[in-house]
Amino acid sequence: MIEYFCEYMFPLTVIALKVVAITIPLILCVAYLTYAERRVIGLMQLRRGPNVVGPFGLLQPIADAVKLLFKEPIIPTDADKILFILAPIITFVLSLIGWAVIPFSSGVVLADINVGVLYILAISSLSVYGIIIAGWASNSKYAFLGAIRSSAQMISYEVSMGLVIITVLLTTGTLNLSGIIEAQKTLPWWIDLMLLPMSIVFFISVLAETNRLPFDLPEAESELVAGYNVEYSSMGFALFFLGEYANMILVSAMTTTLFLGGYLPPFNLSFLDCIPGFFWFVFKVGFLLFCFLWIRATLPRYRYDQLMRLGWKVFLPFTLFGVVLVSSVLFYTDNLPSV
C-alpha cells in the first residue's frame, strides 16, 4: 500500500497541489483586475470608481461574485442546452490551463516542457471554440454574429502572432519558455532593437486575440447588444468574464516571457539580482495589464473592415518582412543560435 502511494498517488498529489497553488491566486488576480480596471478608468474619467463596498472599495469584486452566484441562470427556450452550458466552462478552463508552462521565476514552473511556445499557441487557438459554441448554442443572431466575428478576428491575428514568435525563436534557438528567458541574458543590444517593432505588433495582436478595445468587435454593445454572451446570465456570464480577464493576464505573461526577459531584472546590474525573480515577473505583467486598461480608457473601437485590413494588409506583410530581416541579419552576422 505504501509503495503504491509513493509510486502513483504521491506524484498526483503534488501535481494537484501545484495546480491549486496556481489556480486560486490567479482567480483572485482576475477578480481584482476587474476592480483595478474600474478604478483606473474612473480616475482617467475624473470620477471615483467603486469606493463603497469595504475600504477603498476593495470588497467590490467579492460583492460582484456573490451577486452573480445567486442570480437565476436563464437558458433560452430554443437554445441547445448542453452546449449552452458547456461554452463558458470551456472558455474558462482553457484560459487557466495555459499557465502550466509559464515560468514565474527560475525553476518555478508547473510543466517545463520543451515545446512550451507551441503549447501556448495551441491553447490560444482553442479558446475561440468556447465563443463559437456559445454563439451557435444561444440560437440568437446577435450571439452568432459575435461568434463569427471572434473566429475571423482570431484567425487574422494568430498568423501575425505566430510570425512574430518565429523571430523570437530565431534569436533564442529554443521552444522552451524558460530557455527563451535565459537566452535573453546574452542577446546583443542590436537584436533587442530589431525585436522592438515585432514586440509592438505582438502586443497589438494579443489585444485583438483577447477581444479588448480597440478590437472588441465580437461584443460591440452598439452593434450586437453584447455579442456572443448576450443570452448569458448568472455564472455563465461570470465564467466568460473570468475567462476574458484570465486571458489578459496570460497574454501579458506571454509577452513578458518572450520580449521583456520574464523573471530577469530589467537592467544587468548586480544589486538587482538580490530581488526575487517573481517580483520582476509580476511587475512586468502588471505594467502590461495597465497598458490594457489605459488603451480601453482612451481609444475608440475600430470598424470591422479596419480591423481586417490592419491584420491582413499591414501586420501580415510587416511580420513576414521581419522574419526575413531577422533571419538574414542573424545569418550574415553569424549569430544564429546553436540548436
From Swiss-Prot:
The way it spans or sits in the membrane comes to:
Multi-pass membrane protein
MF-aspect GO terms: NADH dehydrogenase activity; oxidoreductase activity, acting on NAD(P)H, quinone or similar compound as acceptor; quinone binding
Chemical reaction(s) catalysed: a quinone + NADH + 5 H(+)(in) = a quinol + NAD(+) + 4 H(+)(out)
Q: Does the keyword Secreted apply?
A: no
Instruction: Kindly state one GO CC term assigned in the UniProt record.
Output: plasma membrane
UniProt signal peptide: none
Q: Does the keyword Mitochondrion apply?
A: no
Q: Which keywords accompany this UniProt record?
A: Cell inner membrane, Cell membrane, Membrane, NAD, Quinone, Translocase, Transmembrane, Transmembrane helix, Ubiquinone
Question: Which compartment or compartments is the protein found in?
Answer: Cell inner membrane
| Pfam families linked | NADHdh
Transmembrane region(s): 10-30, 50-70, 82-102, 115-135, 161-181, 187-207, 235-255, 275-295, 311-331
UniProt-listed GO biological process terms: aerobic respiration
Q: What is its EC number?
A: 7.1.1.-
**InterPro entries annotated for this entry?**
NADH_UbQ_OxRdtase_su1/FPO, NADH_UbQ_OxRdtase_su1_CS
Primary location group: membrane
Function description: NDH-1 shuttles electrons from NADH, via FMN and iron-sulfur (Fe-S) centers, to quinones in the respiratory chain. The immediate electron acceptor for the enzyme in this species is believed to be ubiquinone. Couples the redox reaction to proton translocation (for every two electrons transferred, four hydrogen ions are translocated across the cytoplasmic membrane), and thus conserves the redox energy in a proton gradient. This subunit may bind ubiquinone.
| Family according to the record | Belongs to the complex I subunit 1 family.
Matches recorded under NCBIfam families:
PRK06076.1-2, PRK06076.1-6
Q: How does this chain assemble?
A: NDH-1 is composed of 14 different subunits. Subunits NuoA, H, J, K, L, M, N constitute the membrane sector of the complex.
UniProt xrefs under PANTHER family:
NADH DEHYDROGENASE SUBUNIT 1, NADH-UBIQUINONE OXIDOREDUCTASE CHAIN 1
**Record's protein name:** NADH-quinone oxidoreductase subunit H
The organism of origin for this protein = Rickettsia prowazekii (strain Madrid E)
Q: Lineage in the entry?
A: Bacteria, Pseudomonadati, Pseudomonadota, Alphaproteobacteria, Rickettsiales
